[in-house]
């Protein structure tokens, strides 16, 4: 790829894009406050997760036909400013009383106003699309978020997903659903199903940065 084309894909948001030692993100935060009431920046990190279905079998948490080597679209990191989310959703059930927002390794399940979850998402969470799932069935459900070194195996010069087994599950970071939030109105559609904390994301990224697949990518800048 010609150098000029590679430069188009550089991360200009966290680099000195303005030429004065200031990143674009920092500039927006400090100089454009009059133009937004709240703002959040996403890293685009997609997690790889396993769970157990109703039969007790381990399954990859992914939509039918989704290539999980590209990451998971069911999980999404939540903004640190809870108002960005909770202005649109309300907690309808939680493991703890007076729950407001997830902390640490806690996960929240988001639904439409009528408590509906897409059947493909339901299957990805380990349930049959015909199951009638109650709040009590979902609360406390555990997932194992697997890091690169445990999820991928190297075959010749390529990294491919390894076989899902108990060893992979046990090696992952365990999280569980602690609350269910539904949309306050019928016009709000959840953009994701499971929301997790930025603190958890930062912890996961601190491991991934030194993983074998990332090291290989760093060596191959072409």
Report each predicted region and the residues it spans.
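Basic-flanked hydrophobic alpha-helices used for secretion and membrane insertion
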Residues: 1-222
């Amino acid at each position: 790829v010609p150098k000029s084309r590679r430069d188009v894909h550089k991360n200009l948001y966290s680099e000195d894009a303005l030429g004065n030692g200031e990143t674009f993100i920092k500039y927006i935060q400090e100089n454009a406050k009059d133009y937004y009431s709240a703002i959040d920046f996403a890293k685009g990190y997609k997690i790889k997760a396993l769970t157990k279905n109703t039969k007790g079998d381990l399954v990859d948490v992914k939509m039918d036909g989704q290539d999980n080597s590209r990451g998971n679209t069911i999980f999404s990191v939540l903004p640190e400013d809870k108002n960005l989310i909770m202005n649109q959703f309300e907690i309808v059930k939680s493991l703890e009383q007076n729950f407001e927002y997830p902390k640490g390794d806690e996960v929240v399940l988001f639904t439409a106003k009528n408590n509906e979850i897409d059947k493909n998402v339901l299957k990805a969470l380990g349930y049959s699309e015909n199951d009638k799932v109650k709040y009590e069935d979902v609360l406390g459900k555990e997932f194992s978020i697997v890091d690169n070194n445990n999820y991928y195996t190297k075959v010749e010069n390529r990294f491919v997903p390894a076989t899902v087994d108990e060893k992979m599950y046990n090696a992952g970071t365990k999280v569980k659903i602690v609350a269910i939030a539904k949309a306050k109105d019928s016009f709000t559609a959840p953009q994701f199903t499971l929301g997790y904390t930025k603190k958890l994301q930062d912890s996961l990224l601190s491991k991934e940065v030194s993983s074998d697949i990332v090291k290989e990518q760093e060596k191959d800048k072409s």
